[in-house]
From Swiss-Prot:
It comes from Neisseria meningitidis serogroup B (strain ATCC BAA-335 / MC58). The record marks 102, 124 as: Interaction with substrate tRNA. Its EC number is 2.5.1.75. It comes from the Bacteria. Monomer. Its cofactor is Mg(2+). GO terms for biological process: tRNA modification. GO terms for molecular function: ATP binding; tRNA dimethylallyltransferase activity. This is tRNA dimethylallyltransferase. The gene is miaA. The lineage of its organism: Bacteria, Pseudomonadati, Pseudomonadota, Betaproteobacteria, Neisseriales.
Length: 313
């Protein structure tokens, strides 16, 4: 039996990945595997720019709407799910197209997993309580004592990563820096071709980000977050789902901690920071082919042709 194949299409948020993936689907019998840590959550459609019903009807999508926002998803689970799906899609005589920008998941898929523990809800709740009582600076100073290497690498206001680093230390008794130094050996059971959309014109990308954020507001993003608060009373500002870009800022706005103009400004700024981090990851990622989504149609056509050649179609 031939080795399964998968074509990965990576890129920053608002960088044209979905549009190009749909163009590939017009020419090849593909099924899309989402590489997006936000799309796994149900009832979070607008703020995640989830593919529309018509787009999902046109081409099968996987790893979308698979868990409620009260649960968490991990890189380890993604590797397991993605590997299984590539095999299943190949067995149907179709091609797997991995699309997204959650680079931590992609690194786990291609380079292996760190021996890190799964998230612990009780411990995370305790850390959140400490943060509320004593402030984020208290948690950061604690991290400096138990894992100075990781603390030096993180910004003092990086609440999510500071909490995760402390969680790893308390669960294992070892600093995260020790775990990150040892990757679990990993060999992909399928052939992978990696392509990326990397815009040279950052101003154009920033413009797209702002336009998309305003479009989300017009589509009812605030109402979507209000619905989440009603439907899932267990959600807090510290829940993994609400840490998604845009949702965290909307949550603070609905809590009365910021006004509407500041919410919009911070939401756009956070999305730009996400894109910057994604591009930083991409610069460190081995790529088989690259295109600029804002240059001309010829650039993206090269990626479509690369997919055809890779799949032998």
């Amino acid at each position: 039996m031939p080795t399964p194949k998968a074509f990965a299409l990576l890129g920053p948020t608002a960088g044209g990945k979905t549009a190009l993936a749909l163009k590939i689907a017009e020419t090849l019998p593909v099924e899309i595997i989402s590489l997006d840590s936000a799309l796994v959550y149900r009832d979070m459609d607008i703020g995640t720019a989830k593919p529309s019903a018509s787009e999902r009807a046109f081409v099968p999508h996987h790893l979308i709407d698979i868990i409620p926002p009260t649960e968490s998803y991990s890189a380890a689970r993604f590797v397991e799910d993605c590997t299984r799906l590539v095999g299943e899609i190949s067995s149907r005589g179709r091609f797997a197209l991995i699309v997204g920008g959650t680079m931590m998941y992609f690194r786990a898929l291609t380079q292996g997993l760190n021996d890190l523990p799964e998230a612990d809800a009780c411990l995370r709740a305790d850390l959140d309580e400490q943060k509320q009582m004593y402030g984020l600076d208290f948690l950061y100073r604690t991290l400096q004592k138990v894992d100075p290497e990781t603390a030096c690498r993180l910004k003092p206001n990086d609440s999510q990563r500071i909490g995760r680093a402390l969680e790893v230390y308390y669960l294992t008794g070892k600093p995260m820096s020790t775990h990150l130094g040892s990757l679990t050996s990993h060999t992909l059971p399928f052939d992978l071709h990696t392509a990326a959309l990397i815009p040279e014109n950052r101003a154009r990308l920033h413009e797209n980000i702002a336009l998309r954020f305003h479009l989300m507001l017009e589509q009812g993003f605030i109402g979507e977050v209000e619905n989440l608060r009603r439907r899932y009373p267990g959600l807090t500002a510290y829940s993994p789902a609400i840490r998604c870009v845009g949702y965290r800022q909307a949550w603070k706005y609905l809590d009365g901690k910021t006004d509407f103009p500041a919410f919009v400004e911070k939401g756009i700024a956070a999305t730009r920071q996400l894109a910057k981090r994604q591009l930083t990851w991409l610069r460190k990622t081995p790529l088989d082919c690259v295109a600029d989504p804002f240059s001309d149609c010829t650039s993206c056509t090269r990626l479509i042709e690369a997919a055809k050649r890779f799949f032998g179609a």
